[in-house]
Amino acid sequence: MTSGKKVLYIIEEITYFTLLIFAITTYCGATSYWNHDQSKIVMVASCSAIVGILCVPLVEHILKINFSIFVDICIAVDLILSIILGEASNVYYRVQNYDKFLHFLGTLQFAVLGYSLSKFFLRETNKGSHQLFFSLMFGFFFAVAIEAMWEVYEFSFDSLCGTNMQKYIPDEFISCVDEKGNYTCSDEEIAAFYATKEGHHFAIMDTMYDIICDTCGSLTGIIICGLIFKFKPSLQDEIIRSEERRVGKE
């Protein structure tokens, strides 16, 4: 691991550990950075970031590869956009379609990463034909699968922690939900909302739009890979390298 990566990891871990402390103190009532429900989301997101950052060198060790600093920078930027800006600064709720933009951007990056992984291992084994087509398909489905797991992640914490990551609770009813997740507003208000087309589709709309954005982002990612890496194959070596090549270069 290069010194640049070590510094980046340390800064990220300190940042999200600090954010976690702020979220815990807010949840306990000692500070008031967010409301009670938002502090839970920030806690979950901060813990996920802390674990996720540590998983990057673990994946490198298991697969015996080295991601370029470009990959780590992309991860750092994504975490800033989603956690620090999106959740901690409430940009998700202030900027329309901000969540959809991040889904599109995330799957685009995962498609490029999946493509690069496939090309790397195919190049290492030097087996098989039509490697470009296979790698493009792998990149597409790799990105969609990662984002599908993200939806499972959101659903799991919504169910276990009472958060609203999947936006299944309408904004106008957020203040009417108790600690057990039950509505405290009148039955007439609830019935009036869910009797409409918007109401009985509401619970799945956010997730389905996320999946659509994921698919579009992944498709865009493999198109970019096909256009750029087809004519500049040397760029593939800038994303993933084997441990042996890195050591030899050093």
Q: What positions do the PLM features span?
A:
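Alpha-helical transmembrane segments of multi-pass membrane proteins
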Residues: 53-57, 78-83, 143-154
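Membrane-proximal helix-loop-helix units in multi-pass membrane proteins
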Residues: 85-140, 155-162
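Membrane-interface helix-boundary motifs at transmembrane edges
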Residues: 2-5, 34-38, 57-70, 124-130
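Cytoplasmic-side transmembrane-helix entry/capping segments in multi-pass membrane proteins
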Residues: 66-77, 100-103
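Conserved small/polar residues in nucleotide/adenosyl-binding loops
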Residues: 244-250
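Alpha-helical transmembrane segments that form the membrane-embedded catalytic/substrate-binding core
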Residues: 103-110, 138, 142-185, 201-226
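N-terminal membrane topogenic signal
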Residues: 1-17
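Membrane-interface helix caps and helix-loop-helix hairpins in membrane proteins
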Residues: 32-37, 62-65, 88-98
